[in-house]
Each structure stands twice: as structure tokens, then as C-alpha cells.
């Protein structure tokens, strides 16, 4: 990414349910006609606002898209996940957008909850146990990378969203929903190896903070990625020149808030470019949380890209 890339986190239409079947949506996700239309609108609005790149969760916390054996181990992808990803690719092409797919969320490792027949989280052992990890990578990650590893609409792969929150002693002290630093690094390294062997797009890991860059130091990543939220890091951290971090690779600001910060979204973009980031993705277009203002997300994209309607002239 040689130019400063501006885009947004979609980051989903429905968390963890865009791709594949679940007890809540036995017919699958985005390939259903009614979901395709909703997707078309969401991507079309982002493209019209000037976004070039969207960040989008694939498996989330594991509530959809997976088949399991009788012992609860992941057996592979269900029969709707790839058709749903195909529908997403079609929508991205139609809108003229590219995507940074996030393979899993840190909630993948959360304590298991069964809600309405759907399994949320509870995948910690598939990260920490080498044999279960190999099974996950062979049966889930490898087929996805093989199918879309040459797809022009896929700009890159984010191996895990904010792994700090599931790494003991880094972002959490709760051993029930985390793994050790060594185990997390092993998971990320093995995942990178599997994806690199099958895909040409660059790999990254969406860190919650630049303070956690050591968690991925030495891993085979092409692009580094950090997020900035004022609740975690001061404005001075955002303004710090990327060159001074000594990372030796492009650094993407993968998330920044459109609500709740002392800086406006436009000021954050200006600061990120001045600091030397390779791009910045607003949070967010579709999420419903304290850091999202969807209207402000679209506004800052239009402002940056010169697509705001001119102010009315005074008489």
C-alpha cells in the first residue's frame, strides 16, 4: 500500500452470521436474496462515500459457517460458507471495493455459550492445542485461502482481530478465555504459514494498540496493523511517527473511532497520514457500539475524498 488508503470497517451486516449456517439462520447468510440486497446497499453507500477498502469479519466468534464432529471438534466448513463468501466477492466487485477479511475475532476464545442452539466462542482449544490447531487450519483456513488467494477483490487477510484481549498477561488476566503469549504467537505463526502457502495477498494482525506490536514481532506478516482508541492510548501515541517505531513494514491504522474521541474523525485521518501510516479505516459503517457513528463514518470519507456537497452560498 504505497498511497494513503482510506476506507472503513464494515465490519459485518450481522456479527458472525454473514458467512455460513447457524441455528439462527439454517439457510446460510449473504447468498440469500434478501441479504444480497442489504449487502448491495451497504457496499454501494461506502463506495459512493469514497471508500476503497473495507475490513470485514469472516468467522467472528465461530457461531456460523462451521461443521463439527460428535465430540465438538471442528470438522470443516459448512456447505453455505463459501457460497456466502462468493456473494460477498460479487458485491465487492459490483461496488468497486476491495476487502481486508478478518479470519477470526478474539471472541473465538471466549467461554462457550449456547444461545438458541448456536455455539458462541468456546474455541480456545483450537488455538492452544497443536493438533486441534492443525485441524482448524487444514479444514477451515486452508480451503478459504485456496479459493480466494488470487481474488483481486481481496486486498489482504487479517489473521485475528485484537488478539491481546485473548492473550494472558497482555490484554486479560482471565485464563478461562485466553491463551499464553507463546500459544497465541504459535497460532498466528501457523496461520500465517498456511495462508501464505495458498494466497498472494498480504497478511496482517489487527492489534488493539501499538503498545502490543511485540506480540507479532518476528512473525511472517507483510503489513502491520494497529488500532487507536483514546480509552487505550493518548493522542500522542497516534501522532508518533511510524518511522520511530522501527517496524520496518507498512503500518495500517485498522480502526479509529467515529464517535467518542476528543479528535474529529477528519483530524484523526490527518494525523495518521502525517505520522506515516499507510492508510486508515474508520470504525464503523454498520456496528452498533459506543465508538460508531455511521453518519460520521460516511461523512469523513466524503470529506476526505472531496465528495461533500458544497455549502450553500450566502445571499
Can you name each region flagged by the protein language model?
Residues 39, 85, 237-238, 265:
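Amphipathic coiled-coil/heptad-repeat helices and related helical stalk/stem segments
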Residues 213-218, 239-245, 268-274:
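Mature extracellular/periplasmic domains of secretome proteins
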Amino acid at each position: 500500500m504505497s498511497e494513503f488508503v482510506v476506507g472503513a470497517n464494515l465490519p459485518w451486516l450481522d456479527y458472525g452470521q454473514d458467512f455460513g449456517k447457524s441455528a439462527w439462520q439454517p439457510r446460510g447468510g449473504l447468498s440469500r436474496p434478501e441479504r444480497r440486497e442489504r449487502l448491495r446497499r451497504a457496499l454501494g453507500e461506502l463506495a459512493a462515500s469514497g471508500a476503497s477498502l473495507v475490513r470485514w469479519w469472516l468467522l467472528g466468534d465461530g457461531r456460523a459457517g462451521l461443521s463439527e464432529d460428535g465430540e465438538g471438534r471442528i470438522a470443516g466448513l459448512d456447505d453455505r460458507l463459501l457460497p456466502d463468501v462468493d456473494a460477498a466477492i460479487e458485491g465487492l466487485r459490483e461496488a468497486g471495493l476491495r476487502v481486508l477479511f478478518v479470519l477470526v475475532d478474539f471472541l473465538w476464545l471466549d467461554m462457550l455459550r449456547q444461545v438458541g442452539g448456536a455455539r458462541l466462542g468456546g474455541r480456545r482449544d483450537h488455538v492452544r492445542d497443536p493438533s486441534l490447531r492443525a485441524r482448524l487450519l487444514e479444514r477451515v483456513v486452508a480451503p478459504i485461502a485456496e479459493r480466494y488467494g488470487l481474488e483481486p477483490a481481496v486486498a489482504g487477510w487479517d489473521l485475528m482481530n485484537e488478539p491481546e484481549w485473548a492473550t494472558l498477561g497482555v490484554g486479560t488476566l482471565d485464563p478461562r478465555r485466553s491463551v499464553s503469549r507463546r500459544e497465541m504467537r504459535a497460532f498466528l505463526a501457523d496461520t500465517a504459514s498456511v495462508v501464505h502457502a495458498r494466497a498472494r495477498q498480504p497478511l496482517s494482525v489487527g492489534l488493539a494498540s501499538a503498545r502490543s506490536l511485540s506480540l507479532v514481532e518476528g512473525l511472517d506478516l507483510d503489513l502491520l496493523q494497529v488500532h487507536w482508541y483514546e480509552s487505550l492510548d493518548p493522542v500522542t501515541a497516534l501522532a508518533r511517527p511510524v518511522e520511530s517505531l522501527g517496524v520496518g513494514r507498512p503500518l495500517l491504522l485498522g480502526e479509529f473511532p467515529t464517535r467518542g474521541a476528543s479528535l474529529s474523525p477528519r483530524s484523526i485521518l490527518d494525523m495518521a497520514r502525517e505520522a506515516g501510516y499507510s492508510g486508515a479505516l474508520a470504525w464503523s459503517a454498520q456496528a452498533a457500539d459506543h465508538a460508531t457513528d455511521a453518519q460520521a463514518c460516511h461523512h469523513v470519507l466524503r470529506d476526505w475524498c472531496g465528495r461533500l456537497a458544497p455549502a450553500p452560498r450566502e445571499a
